[in-house]
From Swiss-Prot:
S-glutathionylated at Cys-207. The lineage of its organism: Eukaryota, Viridiplantae, Streptophyta, Embryophyta, Tracheophyta. Belongs to the class I fructose-bisphosphate aldolase family. Pathway: Carbohydrate degradation; glycolysis; D-glyceraldehyde 3-phosphate and glycerone phosphate from D-glucose: step 4/4. The gene is FBA4. This is Fructose-bisphosphate aldolase 4, cytosolic.
Length: 393
């Protein structure tokens, strides 16, 4: 706990969190602490870390691509998928001068949690010194859900408690678990919604028992020809089911984060809608389903181009209305595409690539405050669609 106070938010921030969050929700949290046998310090830490990650003006870098997925990225820039190249890319990102002031958390793949810089410093220590919380991907991917039309459920609950304990000891303070749903004529089915919602809830409570803030990620794929109204309807159904499941499992909502898709038309719909329309439908879906106790919503980019993801986030934050949560980002491809293009696996391109990453991080920071002016769209690859059908990490 002292590590958190001194290296991430400071004692004054911790005290503010204690008084505003703990005392305000004291009756509810006392019951949860008794029921789940959380220590009082553990509860404080979960809530403070979740609030810190959701700090306005900051967001999450999702650098948790599996070895196979990062290999596909490397193919596009003619780079061999070996450990040294994966480490070099991570170091490029994590050591970009000035960039981590816009980042509150970084989601890591297990390999990266234990990797070091070329000079021998653990990446986790680099993050801590910059005031960035390390996170970890804990799911084991998806498998087909029997009795459905190709729908999936996420695996990884077996042994999750032991893994979370190990990751916490290694420095991780939050976790991510991705559930995937699709829109079709009869999808998502009630079975798929229920199975994925309860899987997310079981994951969330196991994380909290072991000190990790769970990011709840029910991603509704953009694949399909549906319109934006259909996406909004499905998003509301899925989020409502998720929060019912989280309640049933006695998850402390103040110590969680939500990572949803934005509400957009399907990739095959042929429909182009303005950012203001996406913002209206997205915020309305959240207003109808997400409790105010949740400190932050960290959007996934869902295959949008870097620029689309930033512009749409900016529109969401400019929209007037009730928004009791911080609305920020948890982007992977939408923070790294122009950086990858600039780098190309060459040492002499590191400075150029870091400038591209800094520009995107700053742009998304501005978007979380509704102040992005469009001045980061000139980077190579910034307007390139990143959609991959049936995308898997």
């Amino acid at each position: 706990m002292s590590c958190f106070k001194s290296k991430f938010a400071g004692k004054s921030y911790f005290r503010r969190t204690f008084h505003s969050s703990i005392i305000q929700f004291h009756p509810q949290l006392s019951i949860l602490i008794w029921h789940r046998r959380y220590s009082i310090i553990r509860t404080y830490e979960l809530i403070a870390n979740a609030a810190y990650i959701g700090t306005p003006g900051k967001g999450i870098l999702a650098a948790d691509e599996s070895t196979g997925t990062i290999g596909k990225r490397f193919v596009s820039i003619n780079v061999e998928n070996v450990e040294s190249n994966r480490r070099a890319l991570r170091e490029l990102l994590f050591t970009t001068p000035g960039a981590l002031q816009y980042i509150s958390g970084i989601i890591l793949f297990e390999e990266t949690l234990y990797q070091k810089t070329a000079s021998g410093k653990l990446f986790v220590d680099v993050m801590k010194e910059a005031g960035v919380l390390p996170g970890i991907k804990v799911d084991k991917g998806t498998v087909e859900l029997a009795g459905t039309n190709g729908e999936t459920t996420t695996t990884g609950l077996d042994g999750l408690g032991d893994r979370c304990k190990k990751y916490y000891e290694a420095g991780a303070r939050f976790a991510k678990w991705r559930a995937v749903l699709k829109i079709g004529n009869n999808e998502p089915s009630e079975l798929a919604i229920h199975e994925n919602a309860y899987g997310l809830a079981r994951y969330a409570v196991i994380c909290q028992e072991n000190g990790l803030v769970p990011i709840v990620e029910p991603e509704i794929l953009v694949d399909g020809s549906h319109d934006i109204e259909k996406c909004a309807y499905v998003t509301e159904r899925v989020l409502a089911a998720c929060y019912k499941a989280l309640s049933d499992h006695h998850v402390i909502l103040e110590g969680t984060l939500l990572k949803p898709n934005m509400v957009t038309p399907g990739s095959d719909s042929g429909s182009k809608v303005k950012p203001e329309v996406i913002a209206k439908h997205t915020v309305r879906a959240l207003q109808r389903t997400v409790p105010a106790a949740v400190p932050a919503v960290v959007f996934l980019s869902g295959g949008q181009s870097e620029e689309e993801a930033t512009v749409n986030l900016n529109a969401i934050n400019q929209l007037k209305g009730k928004k009791p949560w911080s609305l920020t980002f948890s982007y992977g491809r939408a923070l790294q595409q122009s950086t990858l293009k600039a780098w190309g696996g060459k040492e002499e391109n590191v400075d150029k690539a870091q400038k591209a990453f800094l520009a995107r991080a700053k742009a998304n920071s501005e978007a979380t405050l509704g102040g992005y002016k469009g001045d980061a769209q000139l980077g190579e690859g910034a307007s390139e669609s990143l959609h991959v059908k049936d995308y898997k990490y």
